[in-house]
């Protein structure tokens, strides 16, 4: 049997979070090793599902796309990224344990773009590359795993092509932050499709995208499988996923923002365009 449903971005994030938390390798890393969950809107949902408790999701991020611009939340407004070791939350920054990571340990990182070839794009504003600069090369050198959570709303034609453009020193003008883009060709993307197939004995396809009236950025999916599994999946979607509210979003004052690569840096609220006030 086939079944069809549509998910808003918030609903997709909740589904991805539940799918990530159900992965045996994530459960193993949480119980027996290190599990690092980097900041991001989607990874915040993953963290809630992994911990089984509420997280201040709108502050569990650094870079964000908010009010129609690329933006960075002030460091003082951000929640600390969570590092788990053998089931316990460590009161440390993830970078302090980077050299301790070994086989079975996992980093969960959000993505900003995805293409049909499985390439993941990660936006970078920090001159040192942010999380990518701190973890990617070291993890790659040791053959360790980073799972990139990325919703299908972020599909673009080619991450490889997009990554040839941009860069904070190469962009002459911008509305919002200037940024570069890393193309991760060897990562493990985890989308709504992966979540559905991790949770149920079904196959899933991305059927359509878009919407309005609160469904902007929505994705429509079809699942197919045995009747009982499809029914179980649809009951889950209706009971656990549909109706997930959108995050309100938190934007710091442009006046005191430390990010230099933004045309709004240093501006008082009265000098900002209406969509940013």
Segments predicted by a language model, with ranges:
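Compositionally biased, intrinsically disordered low-complexity regions enriched
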Residues: 47-52, 122, 250, 258-260
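N-terminal active-site beta-alpha-beta segment that forms phosphate/nucleotide-binding
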Residues: 2-85
